[in-house]
């Protein structure tokens, strides 16, 4: 039997096709068939999208609005992927029914633009002359599975926890998933944090230096659903950190040297349609800007088809990007913010 939701979908499809036919000035049956075929194909993709990501809309009007947004994004994805000069592909993901403004407000507004003042982190710089050609910390049990921040501006906590997880694993030989919720709830204004309204990775490191960090199991993440911070409560810290370091700004050789030692927190610009729909390949200069708005984790670097890249772990789940990861173009510049601003604010903790 059809559900009410199935009937809504069917009504909207019929309405949509009828509108196309009534407004069409096409001169032949072949042209008409092509247009209707494209519209039906887009609707099928939208239906598959709803099923894949468990999307439910409250009314026919909302479904129509979301289909319109999906269709615009889907057309942009197809147009991009048909351009053989591009170094990366785009694809349908959980954000394809969101406008750029909606995407920005919910998923790329969790990083404070200015660095935390007087964070207490040391300075780090190096020529990276002895760094290996490729690094992937996932292969050395220093990276936990991709997580999902949900509808909370807590990217900074996932970036910071990932860097701390890596540092602890490399130092102690044990990979432990740490609590982002502890940082959301407990690292307040003293550490430059406003919970789901943003924060800085350096502030998270300073909190961990002062208090230690609890495990994900002991203090599980809930703000992705509640969309707000909870009440800070005590837990038994299992990982402790002694200091943090800020990598020399705009110096990709120093960043390379740091990543050769351990995963490194970075801030990037993610407020573009390219990042919203990124699927695979290497993001390049035309793809994003340098207005920092999102915290992520660099877990390695390498090259692909002659293009150097940084390997970056995101916090939007495995449905986004390349199983939750993105490759961002890399260079050997020592005076350049890098693609998406990747070299502007790198930092890492020490055990």
Located regions from the model:
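Catalytic-core signature of thiol
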Residues: 9-351
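Positively charged n-region of N-terminal signal peptides that target proteins for export
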Residues: 1-11
């Amino acid at each position: 039997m059809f559900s009410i939701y199935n009937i809504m979908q069917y009504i909207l499809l019929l309405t949509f096709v009828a509108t196309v036919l009534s407004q069409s000035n096409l001169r032949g049956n072949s042209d008409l068939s092509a247009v209707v075929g494209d519209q039906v194909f887009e609707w099928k993709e939208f239906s598959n999208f709803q099923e894949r990501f468990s999307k439910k809309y409250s009314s026919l009007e909302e479904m129509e609005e979301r289909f319109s947004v999906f269709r615009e994004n889907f057309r942009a994805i197809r147009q991009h992927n048909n351009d053989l000069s591009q170094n990366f592909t785009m694809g349908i993901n959980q954000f394809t029914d969101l406008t750029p403004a909606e995407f920005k407000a919910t998923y790329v507004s969790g990083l404070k633009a200015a660095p935390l003042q007087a964070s207490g982190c040391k300075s780090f710089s190096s020529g990276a002359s002895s760094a290996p050609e490729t690094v992937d910390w996932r292969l050395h049990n220093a990276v936990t599975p991709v997580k999902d921040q949900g509808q909370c501006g807590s990217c900074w906590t996932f970036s910071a926890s990932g860097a701390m997880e890596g540092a602890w694993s490399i130092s102690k030989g044990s990979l432990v998933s740490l609590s982002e919720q502890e940082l959301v709830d407990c690292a307040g204004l003293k550490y430059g944090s406003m919970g789901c309204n943003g924060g800085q990775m350096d502030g998270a490191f300073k909190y961990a230096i002062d208090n230690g960090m609890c495990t994900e199991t002991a203090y599980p993440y809930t703000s992705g659903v509640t969309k707000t911070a909870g009440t800070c409560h005590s837990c038994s810290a299992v990982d402790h950190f002694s200091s943090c370091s800020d990598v020399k700004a705009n110096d990709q050789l120093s960043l390379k040297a740091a990543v050769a030692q351990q995963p490194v927190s970075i801030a990037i610009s993610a407020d573009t349609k390219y990042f919203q729909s990124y699927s695979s390949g290497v993001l390049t200069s035309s793809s994003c800007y340098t207005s920092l708005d999102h915290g992520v984790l660099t877990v390695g670097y390498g090259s692909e088809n002659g293009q150097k890249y940084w390997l970056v772990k995101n916090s939007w789940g495995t449905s986004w990007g390349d199983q939750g990861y993105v490759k961002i173009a890399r260079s050997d510049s020592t005076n350049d913010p890098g693609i998406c601003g990747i070299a502007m604010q790198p930092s890492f903790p020490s055990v």
